[in-house]
Every structure is written in C-alpha cells, then in structure tokens.
UniProtKB/Swiss-Prot annotation:
GO cellular component, one term: Ndc80 complex
Main location: nucleus
Biased composition (Polar residues): 39-60, 108-121
Region (Disordered): 1-132
Keyword Transmembrane: no
Gene Ontology terms for molecular function: microtubule binding
Species of the source: Cryptococcus neoformans var. neoformans serotype D (strain JEC21 / ATCC MYA-565) (Filobasidiella neoformans)
Name the record gives this protein: Probable kinetochore protein NDC80
Organism phylogeny: Eukaryota, Fungi, Dikarya, Basidiomycota, Agaricomycotina
Family listed: Belongs to the NDC80/HEC1 family.
C-alpha cells in the first residue's frame, strides 16, 4: 500500500485537467535541490522543552486517532473540530480577517522540490529574480467555461442561499461577487468571520493569508468592479481556486481519496509497516484510556480482542516464516547429503591444480622462446633503421633540389588571373582566421562567466550550509550533549559537502542523503514537537477553564456580599432617620429601635459569616484541585509503568523468538 497522501479533490469538479490542490500548496522546484530548504525553527518548535512521558504518549495517541472533519454547511461541530489545532497546519484556516494574518513559520512551505533530472542542476543567473507568472490561461474561453461550471456546481451542491442567474458568473455585480466570496471564505476559513467596513482590504488580507498565487492580478480596482471585462477573468480564476480549496477541505477525511497511515487503524496496516508493535500499543492505550476517562467501562474486552487478533495475525505471519525457514533447512540438508555422496570436490581441485601447474611450466618455456625471437627481431629493426636514415639523407638532397627548381619557377612571370586568385584565397584565409580568433575569445569569455556563476553559487551554498549548521546547533541536532528524545537515533544530521571535489557522484550522494534521510528525520521531529506542543496547549486550556469557573464563583459570592453591605447601609440610614424623628417618643418606640438595632447586628454577623464561608469554600476547592492534579500525575506515571511493562514483555518475546531462530539456524549449520 502506498501511504503517500493522495489528491484531496474529486475529479468531477471541472472537465479540464486542473491541479488537485491550489498552486500555492505545490512546492516550487528548487534549482539547487534540498540545500535551499528553510531549516529555521518555527514559532512552535523554537520553544523547546522537556515534556513528560505521559503527556507525549497522550498527544501521540490523540494525534493518531484524531480525524479531520468535513466542512459541509450544517455541521458546525465538525467544522469546530477541523478548525482546532489537531490539523497539521496548526489551524490557520480558522483565523478571521480581524485576527493576526501572519501564518506561523511552521506552516510556511519551503522549496524542497528537486529537479527531475539526475545530472548537475543549472546555475544560470536570473532564476531567483524573476517574478511568479500565473501558468493558468485566464483569458482562454474554455478555461473560463470550466471555471464557471466548477464554481456553479459547487455552489449548488452546498446550497448557496442566493439565486444564481445566467449573468452571475459571466458579469456579476459587486454585491453578487462579494456575496459569493464571503460565502466561500466563511465555508473555508471561519463560519463566524467578522467583516470590516472595507471589503477590498479584507479580501486582500484573506488571500494573502491563504497564499493565493495570483496576488498580482487581484487589486482593489478589480474588487470594486469585478464584473468588468478586464477584471472578471482574474476574479473568476480566484473564485475557482477558492472552490478547489473548499473541495479539498471537504475531502480532507475521505478514506477513498487519502491514505494517510496515521488515519488507518493499526489492525488494517500491513505486517511490514515500520514499528507496527508500537502503533498497536499506542492505539490500544489511547482507546482504552479515553473509555476509562469517560467512565464508560473498567474492562476493555473489545479492545483486547482487537489487539489479540492483530497479534494473532503477526504470529501467523511469523509461523509462516518459520515454516519457510524449516523448508529451506530441509532443502539445504538434502544438498549436503548429495555433496557427501558425490566425489569430493577437493580431489577435483587438486587434479585441476596439477594440470594448471603443468600448463604454467609450458607457458614459461614458451615465453623464453618468444624472448629469443624478440632479440632477433630487434637486431633486424636496427638494421632497418640504418637503411631508413640513409634514405632520409637522400630524401633531403632531393628536397633541396626541388626547392631550387621551385625558385626558378617563381622567378617566371604569372598571369593577372592567377595573382588575383591567390590574393582572394589569402584574404578568405585571413578572414577565416579572424573569425576563429573571435570565436575563441567569446568561448573564453563565456567560460569565465560560467566559472563566476559557479563560484557565486558555491559561495551561496556555503552560506546556507553555515546557517543550517548554526540552526542545527541551536535546536540540538548536532550537539550530542543535549538529550533530545524526539530525534531519530540513527540519523546523522551533519552535512559535510566538498564542492571542490572532482567526482560529482560524492556531491550527488550527499544531496540524496539530504533528501531521503535528513529531510524525513526533520519532518518527523517537527511533527513530534508539534504534537507535544498541542498536548501542552490543550492542558493549559483545560486549566484556564477551571480557573475561570472558580473566578466566576468568587465573583458571584462577592456580588452577594456587596448586596448585603448595601442593604446594611440602607438599614443604618433608616435607623438614623428613625432616631431623629422619634427622639421625643415614648419607651415603646425605644424598644422598637432596640429591636431594629438587634436585627441590623444579626444581618451584619450573617454577612460576615457568608464571606468567611465563601473564603473557606474557595480554599477547599483549591486544595481539591491540587489533590486532583497530584492524583492525575500519579495515574499517568502508573499508566506509563504499565505500558513499559507491556513493551518489556513484547521485547522479551521478540528476543525469545530471535534466540529460537538462532538455535534452529545453528542446528541447521551443524547438521
């Protein structure tokens, strides 16, 4: 099974082949390969901390079991879960236009696309200075028709509330365009997004956040009059891009389209999947812990049965492998018996050795004879050389005689035609020589320019390599003294590239290692840190929620105390007024005043008692919270210990199996 993520958009949206995801999500090809990849720590990864084992286990289990929900209108619970930080992009699609527009560094996509060719990549100047050009044929009628069909079908499928007319997607008004754009953005980013007074500013900000590749073609003028002939093709392409994003978001969790191994149950993974045992244990622990935490059950028969079935499948595969090895052992035993029955191969080799030694002696004698023949041939060659020298002397004499004759011929008069022909040939040869000199000069200049380009590229690569080493030291990739448990143990993150090497295969090997090993390890490390940070964030949110509840309770108690104090003041005022009015009245009135003062005293005592009881309740709640947190930590430690015991038992079982196989292999070798 291919566990690479497949396309997220169905093919039924447009008749013309379009990218399954927006072009902004496609990683642009790097001219220098993986060396141009941004390795700077992101805003989340830079805050490195030592996390507890229990938290990391819980985060890993939730990371594997959590799913990304669809965003079809009417399912707000699924949309809220999709907008959470459980997604790989950190929930950037859930930000409203009034929130921070900056996408975190962990989401920015670096250029890691390598060239299709395996040879040396081109280092011609001007590659990085060219602006991005939209490859889509925006003015093509067929492309526009496909875009309109795609947008119209999607709006109908998601029940767009406003009516769609024939002119809605050909020359819409500003109000219609704004309505469609807001509907798509609310469906993609945030259903409760608040819009400002200026639609154009919000639109540009949202498109920048979504990394729309054709930002150069979107302006405030075009957004003000989207139905204009010069503006509508760009606006239509932008709406089609948003529709593709919405489709990708709807199909984010469709098992028929994607095949993410983290979203596939561990029981359905192939037996050769790496770390299948760990994955089974993580899924089992996550499932049972969530059930236990919710108080649904104390025994997990269904989960244990699934785990038993998975281990039975693994055991059956191991038994089949053992049977295969046993058949191989029997086959080898039969071969050994056949070798014992046949003639010993050593005797055959000895006879062959005697024959070879005899051939060797004959060959040596043959070489001696050939040496004698060589000496005779050398004598003959020396005699021939002497004859050649004499012939050369005679040839020189003949040549001097020929030169004397040519001088005599030159002294004679030549015709004008012959002179003109000779001059013409000399001029043509001179021009040819000058052209050759110019070509040589141009070739030398071109070679010098290419050498300067290569030198600059090498200097730039050295700078990038220095930055990589510095950042790697900061996050502990190259410092062995730092204990970073999330790093792969068998991955060497050190890059030692000799650009001056004569063999290009060495440089290519380093590049292949960077793409296949280091990049994958860095991606795994980033995902681990992201899961850990997500777990800490969820825990912090829960604690803050509990703290807010306690604060609200305290505020309510304070309000009650304030009301009692107001009532007390009112009663005091009434008592003072009564004293001024009935100062001259009889003793019965004094008794009434005394009774009122007694009631006021009782109310004051009751209010003070209420304050004291509220404070004691707050202190008891804090103590209970601390005890609950302590119990939670103890339970997490016990869960970690139990998981460790299970892992130790599995490791021992593996070691026992390996030792058994070794004993069988040793027995086979002895036989």
């Amino acid at each position: 099974m291919d566990f690479r993520r497949q396309t997220l958009v169905s093919n039924g949206g447009s008749s013309q082949p379009q990218p399954s995801v927006p072009s902004s999500a496609i990683k642009k090809a790097s001219r220098l390969g993986p060396a141009r990849q941004s390795l700077a720590p992101s805003q989340i990864q830079s805050r490195t901390s030592i996390l507890g084992v229990s938290n990391s286990q819980e985060n890993a289990s939730h990371g594997m079991m959590g799913s990304r929900k669809s965003t079809v209108p009417g399912k707000m619970g699924d949309r809220d879960q999709l907008m959470s930080a459980s997604r790989g992009d950190g929930g950037i699609y859930g930000r409203t236009p009034q929130m921070n527009r900056g996408i975190p560094g962990s989401v920015r996509r670096s250029s890691v696309f390598t060239s299709n060719s395996q040879g040396r990549t081109s280092m011609a100047p001007g590659v990085y200075s060219t602006a991005y050009k939209d490859p889509r044929p925006l003015r093509d009628k067929v492309f526009q028709s496909n875009c309109m069909r795609n947008v119209n079908e999607y709006l109908i499928s998601v029940r767009y509330p406003l009516p769609l007319t024939a002119k809605t997607l050909t020359s819409p008004t500003a109000k219609e365009f704004q309505s469609i754009f807001k509907f798509l953005v609310n469906d993609l980013v945030d259903p409760g997004a608040a819009w400002g007074k200026k639609f154009e500013d919000d639109t540009l900000s949202i498109l920048k956040d979504l990394k729309y590749p054709g930002m150069d073609s979107v302006s405030k003028t075009a957004l003000t009059a989207p139905g204009a002939p010069q503006s509508w093709p760009n606006m239509l392409a932008m709406l089609n891009w948003l529709v593709d994003l919405c489709k990708a978001l709807d199909n984010w969790d469709d098992p028929e389209i994607i095949s993410d191994p983290l979203m596939v149950p561990a029981t359905e993974l192939p037996l050769d999947y790496p770390n299948l045992d760990d994955r089974l244990l993580w899924d089992f622990a996550a499932k049972t812990y969530s059930q236990w935490f919710d108080g649904e059950a104390e025994e997990f028969d269904e989960a244990e049965q699934e785990l038993e079935h998975a281990y039975d499948r693994m055991a059956s595969a191991t038994v089949a492998e053992c049977e295969k090895l046993e058949r191989e052992i029997q086959k080898r035993n039969v071969e050994i018996q056949q070798l014992h029955v046949q003639e010993p191969p050593l005797k055959k080799l000895e006879d062959e050795y005697v024959q070879l030694m005899s051939d060797k002696n004959k060959f040596i004698s043959f070489l001696d004879q050939q040496g004698q023949k060589i000496e005779k041939i050398r004598l003959r060659i020396s005699k021939v050389k002497e004859a050649v020298i004499s012939q050369e002397a005679e040839l020189e004499a003949r040549q001097s005689e020929l030169a004397h004759i040519e001088q005599a011929v030159a002294a004679q008069n030549l015709s004008p035609d012959e002179v003109q022909r000779m001059n013409h040939e000399r001029d043509s040869l001179t021009r040819s020589l000058e052209d050759l000199r110019n070509k040589i000069s141009e070739a030398s200049q071109f070679a010098y320019d290419q050498e300067m380009v290569v030198t600059k590229s090498m200097d730039r690569f050295e700078g990038l390599l220095t930055d990589y080493n510095s950042l790697a030291h900061q996050i502990g990739l190259l410092d062995s003294s730092l204990d970073v448990p999330s790093l792969a143990a068998n991955v060497n993150y050190n890059l030692d590239v000799d650009l001056g090497a004569e063999e290009l295969e060495e440089v290519k090997a380093v590049g292949v290692r960077m793409r296949s090993t280091i990049w994958q390890a860095l991606q795994t490390c980033r995902e681990t840190f992201r899961q850990e940070a997500l777990g800490l964030g969820n825990g912090t949110i829960a604690l803050e929620d509990e703290f807010d509840k306690l604060g609200q309770s305290v505020e309510r108690q304070k309000e009650e105390v304030g009301n009692l104090e107001v009532r007390l003041k009112i009663v005091h005022n009434q008592a003072e007024d009564a004293q001024s009015q009935i100062a001259s009245e009889n003793s019965d009135t004094n008794k009434i005043i005394t009774q009122l003062e007694t009631e006021v005293t009782n109310m004051l005592a009751a209010s003070q008692q209420g304050v004291l009881s509220t404070q004691s309740q707050l202190e008891s709640t804090r103590i209970a919270f601390k005890e609950l947190r302590h119990k939670t930590a103890l339970f997490q430690d016990s869960v970690v210990a139990e998981v460790g015991e299970h892992i130790d038992a599995i490791i021992k079982a593996k070691e026992h199996t390996a030792n058994s196989l070794k004993s069988i292999r040793a027995l086979a070798e002895t036989q």
